[in-house]
Design a protein with these regions (language model features):
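A ligand-binding cleft/hinge motif common to bilobed small-molecule-binding domains
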Residues: 64, 80-89, 157-191
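Extracytoplasmic small-molecule ligand-binding "clamshell" domains
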Residues: 1-81, 86
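Short helix-initiation/N-cap motifs at beta->coil->alpha
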Residues: 56-68, 111-112, 146-157, 193
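Short loop->beta-strand "edge-of-pocket" segments that line small-molecule binding or catalytic clefts
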Residues: 13-21, 37, 115-132, 144-145
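Ligand-binding cleft/hinge of the Venus flytrap
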Residues: 27-33, 44-54, 93, 120, ...
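Ligand-binding clefts/hinges and TM-proximal coupling segments of bilobed small-molecule sensing domains
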Residues: 1-7, 11, 131-148, 215-240
């Protein structure tokens, strides 16, 4: 299986790993040589070791850019959230992490529940092409989405335009809430973002090898160890 997977690599002997640096829960720093550090880079490196090849990181500022690179066949695998729209260009394997998504609302907001937010006239700031943006684009019936580049951009838009809510991942929103007096994170979730490894559609051996790698890493507790190693315990959960 591994030999067949390696035969499908874009560059012999090297695994091109697409990394979304915009997810600060999964990419928490940068090494002296410029390589990204965090759970996602560690998963990419471990996958390369599983295949017996070198790892080569290609970093992007958003998950949408990772998907674009996969569509152009510039990467072998991408570590981003599984989402139906992205599955048009990426063949996703089983998820390895799960992160809940909800809303942040300003002080004095009458919005109390997830359902309250989807109402006529409600304006929601969101990180463009994030998994939860794609999810909300499919499911919201009344509220409108206002997009910005990355969560920092969406947070700035939320503040500057005095929008009604900010959509995002729970751990990041909890940090945002600390910087706004009276802001609240709405309890519950509208979705749980499934972080996964995706391959190109025409790489069946690579997908099979990644699936085998994921089964092994979850069974031996490797993913849980990475959560502890990178200081995000309690913010992320190992996917079932």
């Amino acid at each position: 299986m591994i030999d067949a997977a390696c035969a499908e690599l874009l560059s012999p002997g090297s695994l091109r790993v697409g990394i979304n640096k915009g997810n600060i829960l999964l990419v928490t720093g940068e090494a002296d040589n410029g390589d990204p550090e965090g759970i996602a880079p560690d998963m990419g490196r471990a996958l390369a070791e599983h295949l017996g090849v070198e790892v080569y990181y290609q970093c992007f500022s958003s998950p949408g850019e990772v998907a674009d690179a996969a569509e152009r066949q510039e990467i072998d695998v991408g570590l981003i959230a599984e989402e139906p729209k992205r599955a048009e260009v990426i063949s996703f394997c089983d998820p390895y992490l799960e992160i809940e998504a909800t809303y942040l609302v300003p002080a004095g907001s009458p919005l109390r529940t997830i359902d309250d937010v989807d109402a006529p006239g409600i304006r929601i700031a969101v990180s463009e092409r994030a998994a939860y943006d794609l999810y909300l684009s499919r499911t919201l019936q009344h509220a409108t989405l206002h997009r910005a580049r990355g969560l920092p951009g969406a947070f700035r838009l939320f503040i500057d335009e005095k929008l009604d809510a900010l959509a995002g991942l729970v751990p990041a929103l909890e940090e945002n809430a600390e910087s706004i007096i009276g802001a609240r994170v709405i309890p519950g979730r509208y979705t749980a973002v499934q972080q996964a490894i995706g391959t190109l559609h025409d790489r069946p051996a690579m997908k099979a090898a990644v699936q085998a790698f994921l089964r092994k890493t979850k069974s031996i507790g490797f993913v849980a160890e990475l959560i502890d190693k990178h200081g995000v315990t309690g913010k992320l959960q190992v996917a079932k």
